[in-house]
């Protein structure tokens, strides 16, 4: 079985400088799955933090409609992940596929709810109890 190496996404670029690979494992059998992820180096983590600091002012200046559209887009992308995603997560976690589908739906629906809150301007007045 060939192992596909997954890289870190930092400021729109792919990076895999770390020598440590985190292997995806079948939770039931313990056998390796065909994915390994590069553990980020300290420099990669620092680069990601710096990229976030640079990106924040631009995101902060967006209008509520743009932020809501961003949240909706994330929800749509999550929903668009097919059965391969569900099966892979089930193998990695040993959770039943129905549970994974439910968790995905819950997450995408929460993102859409947050988008509506932002869209209608309620986000600024909401406070935790």
Q: Where do the PLM segments sit?
A:
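N-terminal Rossmann-like NAD(P)+-binding subdomain of aldehyde/semialdehyde dehydrogenases
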Residues: 1-129
């Amino acid at each position: 079985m060939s192992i596909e190496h997954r890289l870190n996404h930092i400021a729109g670029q792919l990076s895999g400088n770390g020598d440590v690979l985190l292997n995806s494992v079948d939770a039931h059998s313990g056998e390796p799955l065909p994915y390994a992820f590069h553990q980020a180096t300290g420099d990669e983590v620092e680069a990601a933090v710096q990229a976030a600091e640079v990106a924040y002012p631009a995101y902060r200046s967006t209008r509520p409609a743009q932020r809501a559209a961003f949240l909706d887009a994330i929800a749509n992308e999550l929903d668009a992940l097919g059965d391969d995603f569900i099966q892979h997560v089930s193998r990695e976690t040993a959770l039943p596929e129905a549970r994974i589908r439910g968790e995905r739906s819950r997450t995408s629906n929460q993102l859409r709810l947050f988008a509506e809150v932002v869209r209608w301007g309620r986000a600024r007045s909401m406070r935790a109890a």
